[in-house]
């Protein structure tokens, strides 16, 4: 996974010197454990062909024919749907793959880099998938859902298990429970150790923070889902986007806030199916 090369211009000078890893997309799970085989049936693996169909990002099945992911996963170098494949929920990467083709990639038009927000994209599968007990969609939240600070949610993926420590074979799906961190508090945390003025918002309104020291997403599953259980229903609160390091003090993981983009999502994805 490539590093994001640019930072938001007002933050550039302070962040490059104080936190050189801030531009890393989020790609895996730290402080978690292997997920049991019947959990997270909406989790998908995005693949790109590099001598083999290699996992590079995560995503979530939100409709039998649509996958939600991060825009930075499908930037200009991966914009051709013919060069992508989707693997539905499986316990171990690369074991008996059944890869699905993609007919359309739709990145949010406001996306430039993850730190500027709008880090969200949709993939339309060539054919709808069969919904089963092992593979089914995750519900999107109502626009009124705020996911208050302290709410315990889960993030899943196949990425690194610590800074620069890859997930070892057989590459099981990992999960970790993370608390929601209120945006203003998260923004204050990200200002610690930086010379950036308090009037410069690092954490934008379209973002959501979750995680604490030792429990976080990391560097293989950007685009994956952050889900929270609300009244016995799993709702996708966020899309794994970016952060500084993995599970570092005062640096929660930053996610795209799904409720902020519901109107945009439903412009393409049928709400009822």
UniProtKB/Swiss-Prot annotation:
SUPFAM superfamilies: Trypsin-like serine proteases (SSF50494). Pfam families: Trypsin. Residues 1-18 form the signal peptide. It catalyses: Preferential cleavage: Arg-|-Xaa, Lys-|-Xaa, but with more restricted specificity than trypsin. GO terms for molecular function: identical protein binding; peptidase activity; serine-type endopeptidase activity. The active site is at 72 (charge relay system), 119 (charge relay system), 222 (charge relay system). Residues 19-28 form a propeptide. Glycosylated. GO terms for cellular component: extracellular space; mast cell granule. GO terms for biological process: extracellular matrix disassembly; proteolysis. Mast cells. Coiled coil: none annotated. The keyword Protease applies. PROSITE patterns: TRYPSIN_DOM, TRYPSIN_HIS, TRYPSIN_SER. Keywords: Disulfide bond, Glycoprotein, Hydrolase, Protease, Secreted, Serine protease, Signal, Zymogen. Glycans are attached at residue 49. Residues 29-270 form the Peptidase S1 domain. InterPro entries: Peptidase_S1_PA, Peptidase_S1_PA_chymotrypsin, Peptidase_S1A, Trypsin_dom, TRYPSIN_HIS, TRYPSIN_SER. Belongs to the peptidase S1 family. Tryptase subfamily. Homotetramer. This is Tryptase. The lineage of its organism: Eukaryota, Metazoa, Chordata, Craniata, Vertebrata. The gene is Tpsab1.
């Amino acid at each position: 996974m490539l590093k994001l090369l640019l930072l938001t211009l007002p933050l550039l000078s302070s962040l490059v010197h104080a936190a050189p890893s801030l531009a890393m997309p989020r790609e895996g799970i730290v402080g978690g454990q292997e997920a049991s085989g019947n959990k997270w049936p909406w989790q998908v693996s995005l693949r790109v062909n590099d001598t083999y169909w290699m996992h590079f990002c995560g995503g979530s099945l939100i409709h039998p024919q649509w996958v939600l992911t991060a825009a930075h996963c499908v930037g200009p170098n991966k914009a051709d749907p013919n060069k992508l494949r989707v693997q539905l929920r499986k316990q171990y990467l690369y074991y008996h793959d059944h890869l699905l083709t993609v007919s359309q990639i739709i990145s949010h038009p406001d996306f430039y880099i993850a730190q500027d927000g709008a880090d969200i994209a949709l993939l339309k599968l060539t054919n709808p998938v069969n919904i089963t007990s092992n593979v089914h969609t995750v519900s999107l939240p109502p626009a009124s859902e705020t996911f208050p600070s302290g709410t315990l949610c889960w993030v899943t993926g196949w990425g690194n298990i610590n800074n620069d420590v890859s997930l070892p074979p057989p590459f099981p799906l990992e999960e970790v429970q993370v608390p929601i961190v209120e945006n203003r508090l998260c923004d204050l945390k990200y200002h610690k150790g930086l010379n950036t003025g308090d009037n410069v918002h690092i954490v934008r309104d379209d973002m959501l923070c979750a995680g604490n020291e030792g429990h976080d997403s990391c560097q293989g599953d950007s685009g994956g889902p952050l889900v929270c259980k609300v009244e016995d229903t799993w709702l996708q609160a966020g899309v794994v986007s970016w952060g500084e390091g993995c599970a570092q003090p005062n640096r929660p993981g930053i996610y795209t806030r799904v409720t902020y983009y519901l109107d945009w999502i439903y412009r393409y994805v049928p709400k009822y199916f």
